[in-house]
Regions:
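PAS and PAS-like sensory/regulatory domains
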Residues: 113-118
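Catalytic-core segments of nucleotide cyclases and related cyclic-nucleotide turnover enzymes
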Residues: 48, 85, 89, 93-100, ...
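Conserved long alpha-helical elements within nucleotide-processing catalytic cores of c-di-GMP signaling
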Residues: 2, 7-30, 37-67, 73-77, ...
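Short, intrinsically disordered C-terminal tails of secreted or membrane-associated proteins
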Residues: 198-199
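Active-site core of bacterial EAL-family cyclic-dinucleotide phosphodiesterase domains
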Residues: 18, 153-170
Length: 200
């Protein structure tokens, strides 16, 4: 009833049960909202099986990166929930930085589909009159702020890669119109892994 078969995490029903708990959360409670990026792009370019694998990888990596005493569940689709107990704002920031480092390390094994996500959190200690649902709504709003920031960072990185490609072609004293074939071997995030150029 409470298991998400695709990821092995607690499912939406369990997440909703925890969020609807009328008991006021303890002051040390934190709620984190995670949202995967680029799932639609992966589904469209590589197929839904690749998208499902992307979700599973994130779920496994997130659960492994979080201490066992913290709850991690899937609220649906590409969205996940974590409920923490104990960390203050600084400690939770450090924990989320640790999670990001662990997921970046996991992504090195999958250069074509590195894990990209946004996260926001809210603490009961900062919102003493809030219930669990209120904390989740605040965390979700903060997640969307982070999502816009992540998208801007990825767009800037994409532009830098395009500029590097242009510099490489210029160093060869060629232009794109000279190329008989150019294989940049771009992954779904337009990251250049290797290149081969053949010119007329």
């Amino acid at each position: 009833v409470y298991l998400d078969a695709a990821t092995g995490l607690p499912n939406k029903n369990k997440c909703e049960e925890l969020l609807d708990d009328p008991t006021p959360p303890a002051p040390e409670t934190g709620v984190c909202s995670f949202d995967l990026n680029n799932l639609r792009r992966i589904n469209n370019s590589m197929g839904h099986e690749a998208g499902d694998a992307y979700i599973r990888r994130f779920a496994v990596a997130l659960r492994a990166a979080m201490p066992e005493e913290h709850f991690v569940g899937r609220t649906g689709g590409d969205e996940f929930l974590a409920i923490t107990h104990g960390p203050d704002a600084d400690a939770l920031q450090k924990l989320l930085s640790h999670v990001r480092k662990q997921l970046a390390e996991e992504s090195r094994q999958h250069p074509d589909t590195p894990l990209s996500y946004a996260v926001g959190f809210a603490l009961a200690s900062d919102n003493p009159d809030s219930n669990m649902r209120d904390l989740f709504d605040l965390a979700d709003k903060n997640m969307y702020i982070n999502k816009n920031h992540v998208k801007r960072e990825e767009a800037a990185a994409e532009k830098r890669l395009d500029f590097q490609l242009l510099k490489q072609v210029n160093r060869l004293h060629r232009s794109f119109s000279d190329c008989l074939y150019y294989d940049a071997r771009l992954d779904t995030y337009r990251s250049i892994r290797a290149c081969e150029s053949f010119f007329l």
